[in-house]
Amino acid sequence: MEEYILEIFNSKEELCAKYKIDNIKILKLDDEGAKTRLALIKTKNSNLKFIFMYYDMELKPQLINFFKRNFIILGIQSKIIRINLENNVIDTLVDFSIIPFFEFLENDSYLIAIFEMGISVISKDGELKWKLELPEILIDWEIVDENIKLSYFDGKIGIHSLQIGELLS
């Protein structure tokens, strides 16, 4: 499988000028208007694959390549999106509505998506294992063995099992 990369643009005009294209199909994750940006997914050889319009929360989207599978995972806005590269089917695995996506973490078994007040765990097969909306804003997180340690704005710390999401302490 080819490696896919993510490129961000401030406007449709900027994207069209760089890639010299006139008519593009944009998948809208948010209404045009407010503070939107474009996220372009392409191969390393510059073959354009997908273009998403999203509300810019000042947090950069993140793309994960699953080289042994035929899909990629995109963390963008408040969503985790799985894109099947064989048939171009786009599935929303997680949508926390207004809770912004921060970043992905990985271990040998799972892909962990960290949100401002949420967490989701995805298997290496691209299936959602579990998701959890959290009671407080996260300020720090780390994988510890097969668990995830979450530190909250109010000073509390929680440790969850990555396998089932259960709060261990």
Q: Residue ranges of each PLM-predicted region?
A:
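Short loop/turn segments that connect beta-strands within beta-propeller blades
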Residues: 85-88, 123-127, 162-164
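Aromatic (tryptophan-biased) beta-strands that constitute blades/sheets of beta-rich domains
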Residues: 40-57, 89-100, 127-134, 168-169
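WD40 beta-propeller blade core
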Residues: 81, 120-121, 158
